[in-house]
Amino acid sequence: WAGFGQPGIEGHWAFEEELYLGLCWRWRNIPKPTMVEVQGRVIAGGLMLVWPFDIIVASEDARFSDPVVAFGVNGVEYFGHPWEVGVRKAKEMLFTGEALTAEECKALGMVNHVVSREELKEFTMKMAKHIARQPMLGLKLAKQSVNQMQDAQGLWPSLQAAMSLQHMGH
């Protein structure tokens, strides 16, 4: 029914839609707060692994890029670029393939905190423990409220539309 196991584009599309877009969407909607710590380079598919998280803590040496326009596609399958860094910066990021620094991403709202690599784990764990002490229902409702605001702004249909265009580049 979903196209898995089908030959050609039908099977390929079903696989990528589920593996890339579907999993990222489900991670985004986990009813508990999620955090990720990032160091080094986050390239293309790496963005899809961090963008669904609620809080991103990056080391000072972290760099974020999506150079896949050079391969003839619009960007990674979970096309969160305009939502994560804004429209103009998303275009620059995609058109040039150049990396954004952790500090740039913090200024754009994509990264919550930038710390030294030595402090990364301790800082992230301290914040996670602080959040874990909050009432679970309040956390769930707060996360759901923010996610629903993005949904009302059209995040999901935008991701689906970009995914369709991404397949044209294959």
Go through each PLM region and give its residues:
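Short, structured loop/turn "capping" segments at alpha-beta junctions
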Residues: 87-91, 100-107, 135-139
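Short alpha-helical scaffolding segments that buttress acidic/His motifs in well-ordered protein cores
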Residues: 93-94, 142-145, 162, 166
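C-terminal long alpha-helix characteristic of the crotonase
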Residues: 57-62, 111-160
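Glycine- (often His-adjacent) and acidic-residue-rich active-site loop
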Residues: 1-22
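N-terminal glycine-rich phosphate-binding loop for ADP-containing cofactors
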Residues: 53, 155-169
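CoA-thioester-processing core
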Residues: 22-29, 37, 43-94, 123, ...
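Terminal peptide-recognition signature
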Residues: 33, 50, 105, 142
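Well-ordered beta-strand positions
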Residues: 54-55, 92, 96-98, 104, ...
